[in-house]
């Protein structure tokens, strides 16, 4: 089987999407993350499904990959990495609280929340965002589709104008 045309079509689509990203918002996000690092603030990150895997990978890339080469390391904390904590909260309180409840125990004013939701409407992510905003934290939102509520609530919105989560 020859996938050459499929590969070309896929790459062309990816290039078009990348061209539509707002580089000013990406720059603002990087500056906020760096300012938070320099102030020794914490950066919380969360998402569901594939976005959870992305959140976990972000934590790894910044805490190990980037921090290995700088004096003041990043302090990323992925809210979906502790399965026992997630399951206890989901079982005893409700899945809509799995991220907000963890923030309640740890969040401080100079911290940042990076929230990832393809639709921008994941209820548990939105509850965490609202809680963090109420406590003076900045929000970086990563969204697709129309961006949903997360795009509206984010201080910095990294929105990919796509209608697929591939």
Residue ranges and their predicted role:
Residues 1-21:
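Generic N-terminal amphipathic, Lys/Arg-enriched alpha-helix
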Residues 7, 26-29, 55:
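Hydrophobic packing residues in well-ordered alpha-helices of helical domains and bundles
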Residues 13, 39-40, 153:
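Structured helix-beta-strand junction loops
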Residues 21-39:
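A short, well-structured juxtamembrane/interface segment
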Residues 42-46:
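Short glycine-rich phosphate-binding loop at a beta-alpha junction
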């Amino acid at each position: 089987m020859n996938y050459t045309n499929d590969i070309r079509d896929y790459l062309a689509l990816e290039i078009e999407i990348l061209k539509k990203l707002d580089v000013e918002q990406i720059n603002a996000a990087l500056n906020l993350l760096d300012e938070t690092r320099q102030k020794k603030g914490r950066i919380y990150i969360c998402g569901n499904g594939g976005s959870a895997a992305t959140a976990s990978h972000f934590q790894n890339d910044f805490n190990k990959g980037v921090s290995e080469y700088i004096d003041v390391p990043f302090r990323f904390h992925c809210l979906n990495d502790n399965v026992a904590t997630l399951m206890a909260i989901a079982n005893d309180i409700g899945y809509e609280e799995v991220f907000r409840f963890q923030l309640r125990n740890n969040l401080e004013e100079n911290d940042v929340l990076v929230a990832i939701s393809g639709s921008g409407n994941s209820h548990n992510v939105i509850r965490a965002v609202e809680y963090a905003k109420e406590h003076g934290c900045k929000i970086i939102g990563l969204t697709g589709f129309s961006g949903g509520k997360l795009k509206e609530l984010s201080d910095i919105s990294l929105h990919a104008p796509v209608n697929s989560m591939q």
